[in-house]
UniProtKB/Swiss-Prot annotation:
InterPro entries: Ribosomal_uS10 (IPR001848), Ribosomal_uS10_CS (IPR018268), Ribosomal_uS10_dom (IPR027486), Ribosomal_uS10_dom_sf (IPR036838). One of its GO terms (cellular component) is ribonucleoprotein complex. The keyword DNA repair does not apply. This is Small ribosomal subunit protein uS10. Part of the 30S ribosomal subunit. Keywords: Ribonucleoprotein, Ribosomal protein. Pfam families: Ribosomal_S10 (PF00338). Involved in the binding of tRNA to the ribosomes. Belongs to the universal ribosomal protein uS10 family. It comes from Methylobacterium radiotolerans (strain ATCC 27329 / DSM 1819 / JCM 2831 / NBRC 15690 / NCIMB 10815 / 0-1). GO terms for molecular function: structural constituent of ribosome; tRNA binding. One of its GO terms (biological process) is translation. The gene is rpsJ.
Length: 102
């Protein structure tokens, strides 16, 4: 796989699970002899929601919720066939969204 890069984008709501999955991918890729760029932390997307506390009166009384989406990017430069096989067999934690681009 000469001259090809693999870009892996990871998304999760919990940054601890995301960092653990990133470390797992990095250690697997290094063990198989590939070079890695990253992990690069991307900006955290924060979605905020404001709702009324009461169902019908007290418009001034509101409650705010937020949902944070943490993201990381990894680039694997010149992966070996063993690297691709190891990444395919890797079992990551639930709650981590993985996008792989060649």
């Amino acid at each position: 796989m000469n001259g090809q890069n693999i870009r892996i984008r990871l998304k999760a709501f919990d940054h601890r699970i995301l960092d653990a999955s990133t470390k797992e991918i990095v250690s697997t890729a290094k063990r198989t002899g590939a070079t890695i760029r990253g992990p690069i932390p991307l900006p955290t997307h924060i979605a905020k929601f404001t709702v009324n506390r009461s169902p019908h009166i007290d418009k001034k009384s509101r409650e705010q919720f937020e949902m944070r989406t943490h993201k990381r990017v990894l680039d694997i430069v010149d992966p070996t066939p063993q690297t691709v096989d190891a990444l395919m067999k890797l079992d990551l934690a639930a709650g981590v969204d993985v996008e792989i681009k060649l």
